[in-house]
């Protein structure tokens, strides 16, 4: 059986002088403390990608930066699904007996570690290099296509989807580490 034993989160915003590895380290330290563990007890690490630190072996780079020597290290890159995918993979690693304590970590510092243009350029590379990138779609365009298809297949309206955004913001209001702290309405979303 596996379960989440600790959580750590850095605040959203500008972090002058801190790299994405530094932010990951701060969050990891908080998560380990919350779990009541010591660094030496971490025997697995899953590390999400960072557009500001685009290293092909980011999990091992982070492990070295953070000062741990896990027996299992894996970098995960599946866009917006990375957090959930890492959580699922951590569960599978524990259930399979590969690791007992898996640290799941990710972090970005785009507001201070990357220019606006560099962020847009990095995020514009998520499509197929031959069939999509030359046409110039961005991540919102991809999600728009998915939403349009979902609406078509399930009879959902734009207002229905707006209600979901309102619900997510309502939940975020109770979280001190949330990116946004003001409530929104369906009218706000639809504007």
Outline where the language-model segments fall:
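Conserved "HGTGT" condensation-loop signature of ketosynthase/thiolase-family condensing enzymes
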Residues: 1-73, 92-96, 103-191
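Conserved beta-loop-alpha segment that forms the PLP phosphate-binding cup at the N-terminus of a helix
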Residues: 82-87
């Amino acid at each position: 059986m596996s379960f989440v034993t600790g959580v750590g989160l850095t605040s959203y915003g500008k972090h002058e002088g801190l790299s994405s590895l530094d932010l990951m380290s701060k969050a990891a330290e908080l998560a380990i403390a919350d779990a009541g563990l010591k660094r030496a007890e971490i025997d697995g690490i899953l590390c999400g990608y960072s557009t500001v630190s685009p290293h092909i072996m980011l999990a091992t780079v982070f492990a070295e930066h953070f000062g741990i020597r896990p027996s299992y290290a894996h970098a995960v890159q599946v866009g917006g699904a990375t957090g959930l995918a890492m959580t699922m993979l951590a569960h599978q690693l524990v259930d399979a007996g590969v690791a007992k304590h898996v640290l799941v970590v990710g972090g970005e510092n785009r507001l201070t570690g990357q220019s606006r243009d560099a962020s847009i350029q990095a995020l514009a590379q998520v499509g197929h290099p031959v069939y999509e990138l030359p046409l110039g779609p961005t991540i919102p365009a991809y999600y728009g296509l998915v939403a349009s298809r979902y609406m078509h297949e399930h009879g959902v309206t734009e207002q229905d989807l707006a209600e979901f955004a309102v619900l997510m913001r309502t939940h975020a209001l109770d979280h001190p580490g949330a990116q946004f702290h003001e409530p929104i309405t369906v009218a706000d979303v639809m504007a």
